Regions:
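Glycine/charged-rich beta-loop-alpha catalytic/anionic-binding loops adjacent to active sites
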Residues: 16-18, 73-77, 179-182
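Glycine-rich nucleotide phosphate-binding loop and flanking beta-alpha elements
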Residues: 46, 86, 166-170
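Active-site/ligand-binding-proximal alpha/beta "capping" segment
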Residues: 159-182
Length: 182
């Protein structure tokens, strides 16, 4: 089943065009033809659609009906120091699949990689959302300092700090204790 993120407003009986990139994907990569079905989604839900035609502007689709409402997702943020591209891509993909709502790249004293390609990260987030059957697409913040992040962190939120050298209070133990609490 082909699922595509659709940033425009979606409603039944709407006729719209896919982007050129999405049109290339459905026509040339997935080889969908006129009359084939696909799904489009945004933060409001998921709709079934049919390809009406391939045009210069892109594939023209008709939205048929809503098949799924938006999900009630937990407000999970993932703050991380920028790292090299391949491990960063992995973090973004898996975080999206696991339900992260916001990615926050943090600059600290020991951060080696000082910038990330936000446009590329957004593309990875959309692709991971499409593949993992999510309705929402997580946000990616601009780089910020650790001090700024901590000053804006919600007072009623839980903050888990992961340290590769920590042996006693590892993430598994902390989360299992939290689940056991009423």
């Amino acid at each position: 089943k082909i699922r595509l993120y659709f940033s425009d407003k979606i409603q039944s009986d709407l006729v719209s065009h896919l982007t050129k990139e999405q049109s290339h994907y459905v026509k040339d990569v997935m080889r969908l033809e006129k009359g084939d079905y696909l799904s489009v989604f945004n933060a409001q839900g998921e709709w079934s659609a049919i390809i009406e035609n391939y045009e210069k502007e892109g594939a023209r689709i008709k939205i048929l009906k809503k098949v799924r409402d938006k999900d009630n997702e937990k407000n999970i943020w993932l703050a991380f120091s920028p790292i090299k591209q391949n491990p960063l891509n992995f973090i973004i993909q898996k975080g999206t699949e696991l339900g992260v709502q916001k990615f926050i790249p943090i600059l600290s004293e020991r951060t080696i990689v000082k910038e990330i390609n936000i446009t590329r990260v957004k593309k990875i987030i959309v692709e991971a959302s499409e593949q993992s059957n999510r309705i929402s697409v997580p946000e990616i913040n601009n780089l910020e300092t650790l001090k700024n992040f901590l000053s804006q962190f919600p007072k009623n939120g839980y903050l888990l700090f992961c340290d590769i050298n920590c042996e006693k209070n590892n993430l598994k133990n902390i989360l299992s204790k939290k689940i056991e609490e009423p």
